[in-house]
């Protein structure tokens, strides 16, 4: 890689220095040819990150990652710094705790997501939470060629709506539901420290601590994945088909009125699935409560090939979601609070992409807890996971100009009015996690082998039935 001082635009050079380009570089290919065995992950991922950070630290001022790697290298065999070989072997021998420190540096450097160039670059060669299901189904065809992150979203569309309302949902969870629990609301890119091929970024996590620039996850940490439902956005108007059902829910918050509200649109977000039947892939929430069975829809039986779905359904069927109905600011001097709580039998759909999204978040945060000292002896190091479904209405002339969440947290004037929040706990069986990650890792390995002459091997711990992969 060219020296930064020789580049007309070092930032432009950085944005093109992907993991794929690193693997194809003459320096890397020469280094690999001199090894007595193929290079391994995650060490090669960290070697790449070292090379990237070494180039950008001259104008970013961030030296922590490279300094920590240097402390792991036994020999400095060059006046210009350690060789790739020395760096690789230092990282190959690193402990999971040391690798987690390296990943924590990366997370701290990449906060801001779409506004952070490094966050975009690091997705190359990574199976992210949003790509996990497609990788299992179709292979990682886009993992080494991810589409650029788009920030130009139509204001009135669903993506812009979700981005606009996400902070409001975080405020509701942190202030009104969790009672001002310690929380982190902005995360960088979190690479799995033990394998280097999976990565996630969280919306919100409560019960976390700070250690300098690092986030310390604990065995009490709770992840919240936020979904703002654009298709339920409605107006306070008798001509809006959703409004009458919302009015009934607001006047009498209960299971029956919530069922009416959810089914007020053509493709409702909750699907009724009786025991022993296969859910569709249409949306991400299910129920087995007969009260939701409003129309006769024939469903296939669970059968051969549905083992993971069956295991996940069995683990989640008993889950109780909590619906929080919010007060109307036009009736409460602009104040939005929790009007009522309604428990409902709603759980996640294990055939939907969002299930795999939170599965990978659960796995990686669990790795951070185990390898960063956040877990107490004798306690499960796994975090809790919830998916949050938020419903909004458009602003009305009757709404006060200034609205607050609780008594003092100002609601941005550009954001719609939150009317209800559904919090759904997610249970992730170990067998489902192992099989899912094993399948995805095998797909990543096969694609890398066919794409790169210097493809690094994947850790054997990801392969439940394959002892041949080092």
From Swiss-Prot:
UniProt xrefs under InterPro entries: Herpes_alk_exo, Restrct_endonuc-II-like, Viral_alk_exo
Marked site positions, Required for function: 166, 203, 225, 227
GO molecular function, one term: RNA binding
Protein name: Shutoff alkaline exonuclease
Any Pfam family: Viral_alk_exo
GO cellular component, one term: host cell nucleus
Functional note: Plays a role in processing non linear or branched viral DNA intermediates in order to promote the production of mature packaged unit-length linear progeny viral DNA molecules. Exhibits endonuclease and exonuclease activities and accepts both double-stranded and single-stranded DNA as substrate. Exonuclease digestion of DNA is in the 5'-> 3' direction and the products are 5'-monophosphate nucleosides. Additionally, forms a recombinase with the major DNA-binding protein, which displays strand exchange activity.
Principal location listed in the UniProt entry: host cell
Organism: Epstein-Barr virus (strain AG876)
Parts of the chain that traverse the membrane: none
Quaternary structure and interacting proteins, as annotated: Forms a complex with the DNA polymerase, the DNA polymerase processivity factor, and the major DNA binding protein.
GO BP: symbiont-mediated degradation of host mRNA; symbiont-mediated suppression of host gene expression
UniProt subcellular location: Host nucleus; Host cytoplasm
Keyword line: Decay of host mRNAs by virus, Early protein, Endonuclease, Eukaryotic host gene expression shutoff by virus, Exonuclease, Host cytoplasm, Host gene expression shutoff by virus, Host mRNA suppression by virus, Host nucleus, Host-virus interaction, Hydrolase, Nuclease, RNA-binding
Entry EC number(s): 3.1.-.-
Lineage of origin: Viruses, Duplodnaviria, Heunggongvirae, Peploviricota, Herviviricetes
Family of this protein: Belongs to the herpesviridae alkaline nuclease family.
